[in-house]
Amino acid sequence: MTEEMNQIDVQVPEVGDVVKGIVTKVEDKHVDVEIINVKQSGIIPISELSSLHVEKASDVVKVDDELDLKVTKVEDDALILSKRAVDADRAWEDLEKKFETKEVFEAEVKDVVKGGLVVDIGVRGFIPASLVEAHFVEDFTDYKGKTLSLLVVELDRDKNRVILSHRAVVESEQANKKQELLQSLEVGSVLDGKVQRLTDFGAFVDIGGIDGLVHISQLSHSHVEKPSDVVEEGQEVKVKVLSVDRDNERISLSIKDTLPGPWNQIGEKVKPGDVLEGTVQRLVSFGAFVEILPGVEGLVHISQISNKHIGTPHEVLEEGQTVKVKVLDVNENEERISLSMRELEETPKADQEDYRQYQAKEETSTGFQLGDLIGDKLNKLK
């Protein structure tokens, strides 16, 4: 800033001098001022009040306002003055410092124009639409009158060009918050989150400034075909932190671990002797795993599949088949349930007939009947 701009006690002002004036009258298109220590009065044309377009002078100043003004023309009866020129000189110096130090400052949005927002910071500052927010904004109408935190991203005094960014400030704050959150996260902690987006392999959940992944296997205790079957974008959920990779900024989360497990209080839901309907989930050499409740599987040992001898479970069962089973045993601590299909089978009539014929042959070959044997035993006890 020049020495002339700091000089306020000027007896005979010249063009370029800076003087102090007090507003005495506000007209629509100009402002009358009394210049301190100068006999001549001053006039500020409406075009010299601000770097922005002004409809009425009263929108910028009022009577008794004390202003620093630059002399732009000396006439016999009055000095022609500019508030805009003083504001601009000071603004450029201030903006150059802010640009060098990357200082964040605040300014009010004065106008919404095609392509962005306009602020008055002593000079006209422009915020392109792409630099307003970190997210897409369709309509900027509501931004007029808002105060935004800004960063100077481009400055050219010769071209009177000032480009500002609110997005840069937001992204910087988000990055700082993200790092703070990454450092504070603890494995095992349960947090509130919001589902941001769904993929084939899971759901990304915002836990307060950073997204973590809930893998599809961690969405539910039961099998999930696709994430959209369980959660939707925008849904608020509770998640448990499974792991934190601070170097790569990756967080693994689980919704499943915050929900009651399917084995929780299973002893009250399933008891020995219960007959249930289930679905064969897996066949192994030693039996079949049957889902009897969502997320709860029991084992039908190969010896409990059929009254008939079978070599492998595949001979009589297939995955996805619906079967009836009887509960033999429930071990809640080890999450094991023993089931039987054999106990629900009826003994084939052919087998019953074979047994009767066998019994008759035995009685004939020994020369006495079962009843005689029992009778003899009873007589010996008398």
From Swiss-Prot:
Residue ranges that the Swiss-Prot or TrEMBL entry lists as coiled coil:
none
Q: Name one GO molecular function term.
A: structural constituent of ribosome
GO terms in the biological process aspect are:
translation
Q: What happens when the gene is disrupted?
A: No visible effect on growth. Decreased sporulation at 37 and 47 degrees Celsius.
Recorded hits in InterPro entries, A to Z, give: NA-bd_OB-fold (IPR012340), Ribos_protein_bS1-like (IPR050437), Ribosomal_protein_S1-like (IPR035104), S1_domain (IPR003029)
Alphabetically sorted, this entry's keywords are: Phosphoprotein, Repeat, Ribonucleoprotein, Ribosomal protein, RNA-binding
Entries under Gene3D superfamilies matching the protein: Nucleic acid-binding proteins (2.40.50.140)
The Swiss-Prot or TrEMBL record describes its family as follows:
Belongs to the bacterial ribosomal protein bS1 family.
Query: Which NCBIfam families does the annotation name?
Result: PRK06676.1
Q: Which function does this protein serve?
A: Plays a role in sporulation. Cannot be expressed in wild-type E.coli, does not complement an E.coli rpsA deletion.
Q: What is this protein called?
A: Small ribosomal subunit protein bS1 homolog
Q: Which organism is it from?
A: Bacillus subtilis (strain 168)
